[in-house]
Regions:
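N-terminal capping segments
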Residues: 1-25
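Short hydrophobic alpha-helical module
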Residues: 5-9, 57, 443-446
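Acidic Ser/Thr/Pro-rich low-complexity disordered segments
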Residues: 11-13, 89-101, 448-454
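...with weaker cross-activation on analogous glycine-rich loops/strands in unrelated enzymes
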Residues: 18-88
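Hydrophobic beta-strand residues in large extracellular and virion-surface proteins
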Residues: 54, 81, 103, 318-320
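Aromatic- and glycine-rich peptidoglycan recognition patches
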Residues: 63-133
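Preference for protein termini
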Residues: 132-456
């Protein structure tokens, strides 16, 4: 709260207070800018300053969680801090600190001493680009990133119908793939909990980096031209970014990971899939045959999606648009369940055949319901192809229809219609395009999560 209210910045999610000391950036809420955050160990030649974060390791009084405080004032050889969960009585009127900690200056270093004798102060964190005396970001040990293969004992667990075909979603999956999760259902892979946390940390940080790169692209025509997006859409793209930067529901980052580290190579920002496989089918597989320790990291995925929809600006009725592809049936149904859990009314549209226009030229479905909010399984690229089919030189605006003699509705007539709120927003085509990778590398050279990439 202190960082947000006083500086308009926040840090990414962490499980425990002591983990804050491993972070190296803050996010500026108003524009998603990434600001450098440096960590200085207790005893550092870099003095603590008012407004800095003070971090304790887990242990003693702060068992398991560690502790975090704000340095509010340097007062002689004392540092005054504000914190929670230590002082449980009201502070004197006008007092803006909870405790005073002794600061010892010796041998060119600054050391803070806690009032508890069983705790360890890790150090302080300052938002600055100056890295002198700062600690490097901790790196996870390579062996903890190893993906390990294992086998279940074959007792015929998957010989029969182990997926419940009476359940519409599971049945849709079976219709597309059969009672199959992979070529050998007895072979599976595991990662360590440390690797899972590293993936979470990397995803959060990279998402902000992709947003930063997207902003740079949309401000530079020369960069935007590299993305092969019809020029007639450029004003729409920029408007989408300005108005709907925080309207994204879901995306999927693809990583390569082994003992050498973790690298991102694609961000499916405008058309993520695999929700059903991760959030349902893998759960059913585990219930059917897995007896070991651990858990499926995606077991709460549908609740997370429902939460994202609850906090979205989607309209009360959402049409779910999918292609006439059997695999997309279960993808659409999984998202429909998330939407319904979030309290939305829904209808799945398979293809575009039932869409048309009413007498006023408004887009309607086969039941006559107005179509004004959609979530799509399609990527944006098929809509771009439709625009490329007609020369954009012939039009001063995107050539969408408000009627047609044969009542034929194209994808662009839905997704690019001004009154239709589409998810994912149009701007997501920028982070979803591989042309973003060289721009990321130019902005964050030698970043540990990036591959060295350039335009050839």
């Amino acid at each position: 709260r202190f960082l947000f209210l006083n500086y308009g910045v926040v840090f990414t999610d962490v499980g425990m207070a002591w983990e804050i000391f491993s972070l190296r950036f803050l996010r500026e809420v108003v524009n998603d800018n990434i600001l450098p955050l440096q960590a200085f160990p207790n005893g550092s030649p870099r003095a603590p300053v008012a407004g800095a974060l003070l971090i304790w390791d887990k242990g003693g009084e702060f068992k398991d969680t560690g502790h975090v405080a704000i340095i509010t004032q340097l007062h002689g050889n004392k540092v005054r801090i504000a914190e929670q969960n230590v002082i449980h009585t009201p502070l004197p009127q006008g007092q803006q600190w909870t405790r005073e900690l002794e600061m010892v200056v010796e041998n060119g270093g600054y050391t803070l001493k806690d009032t508890f004798d069983d705790t360890t102060i890790l150090g302080w964190m300052i938002q600055t680009e100056d890295t002198k005396y700062s600690l490097p970001q901790p790196e996870i040990a390579g062996e903890l990133l190893k993906i390990s293969g294992a086998r279940l004992e074959n007792k015929g667990q998957f010989d029969g119908k182990w997926l419940d075909e009476k359940d519409p979603l599971q049945n849709a999956y079976v219709q597309a793939n059969g009672q199959v999760i992979n070529q050998d259902p007895y072979h599976y892979y595991t990662i360590t909990e440390s690797a899972e946390q590293e993936l979470i940390k990397a995803t959060n940080e990279l998402h902000l980096m992709y947003l930063h790169a997207t902003d740079k692209v949309l401000k530079d025509d020369n960069l935007l031209a590299l993305f092969d997006i019809p020029k007639i859409l450029w004003p729409r793209l920029r408007l989408s970014w300005q108005r709907r930067r925080h309207h994204m529901i879901t995306g999927r980052m693809d990583f390569c990971m082994d003992e050498r580290g973790l690298k991102v190579y694609e961000y499916n920002a405008d058309s993520a899939s695999c929700h059903t496989e991760a959030g349902l089918i893998l759960e059913r597989w585990a219930e059917q045959g897995y007896k070991g320790n651990g858990f499926n990291p995606a077991e709460g995925l549908i609740k997370e999606l429902a939460g994202a929809w609850k906090h979205s600006r989607a309209r009360p009725f959402v049409h779910i648009m999918q292609d006439n592809d059997i695999e997309e049936n279960y993808h659409a149904q999984f998202m429909e369940q998330a939407l319904q859990q979030a309290g939305f009314e829904t209808r799945i549209l398979r293809g575009l055949d039932e869409l048309g226009w009413d007498a006023a030229g408004q887009l309607i479905d086969g039941e006559g319901r107005l179509v004004n909010c959609v979530w799509k399984t399609w990527a944006w690229e098929p809509a771009f192809d439709q625009i490329r089919e007609v020369s954009d030189r012939e039009f001063a605006a995107v050539p969408i229809r408000t009627g047609h003699p044969q009542n034929e509705v194209r994808l662009i007539d839905v997704l690019l219609r001004p009154e239709v709120l589409g998810f994912e927003p149009l701007w997501t085509v920028i982070p979803g395009n591989k042309a973003i990778l060289p721009i990321l590398w130019s902005l964050f050279p030698h970043h540990r999560y990036l591959l060295d990439t350039d335009f050839t």
